Amino acid sequence: MVKKVIENFNISQICDSGQCFRMTPIYKNSDHVPGEVRMKVIAFDRYLEIHQTGKDCVFNCSEEEFEEFWKVYFDLETDYSVYMSRINPNDKYLMNAAACGSGMRILRQDLWEMIVSFLISQQNNIPRIRKCIENICREYGEKKLNENGEEYFAFPKPEVLAELDEDALKACNLGYRSKYVVRSARSIVNGEVNLDEIREMPYKKAREELLKLFGVGVKVADCICLFALHHLQAFPVDTHIHQAMETHYKRGFPKRRYKGIEGVLQQYIFYYELNFSPGKM
């Protein structure tokens, strides 16, 4: 068990930010502490439970595992207040969005999992994406046990999904997106797209390579670049971001001013639009 006091880290905001789909709340009424948030996270085949009350965080893992893996995964070595300090104080909309999502972090997630997750995300919503991912993992992922003896499932490898026909994944509620996942898995297994090489590529080259995968468009490629490869200059534009741009940045978002951190600001905007924009309150 590792206890930390962490600034600009809110596990609930991260969970609801649309960047990760295997982070879910834990409800145990018998020992609930008022004001405490509990989450379970499955990442890179690992299982973690987090308890957070304000800035106080308890990570249910060893100090060694926290230092070597989870600190990196949650990007805890980065001072996000530096990013927020770069926001133009005259931009009241962006200032407000950052304040509402000040606990956001850009997670360092698995590349293959993000490819599948954002292929599934097209014309979809967060609860349904989570359910689809859960179905795939339960059906085709390796079963594992956490420290409490509870089972969870690893994310299935490309080699596993490449062997399926599209109808098999349709049974996991993927619908027409099934063909995207199966064909992308086959492209990776056949060596047409090399994930190890993509991990080493700069942003634009990585995006270009990801676009070779069936079903991957610019928005999906940018999501993968941001949430798996940590290319913070990636700026995915979905319907929420498009609406924000139309309303608040008619001349275009000032990417030059925010060069290198555009993706962080995109997450503040996305989270705000999803949870706090007029009509959401």
For the regions a language model picked out, list residue spans one by one.
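HhH-family (HhH-GPD) DNA N-glycosylase catalytic core used in base-excision repair
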Residues: 1-281
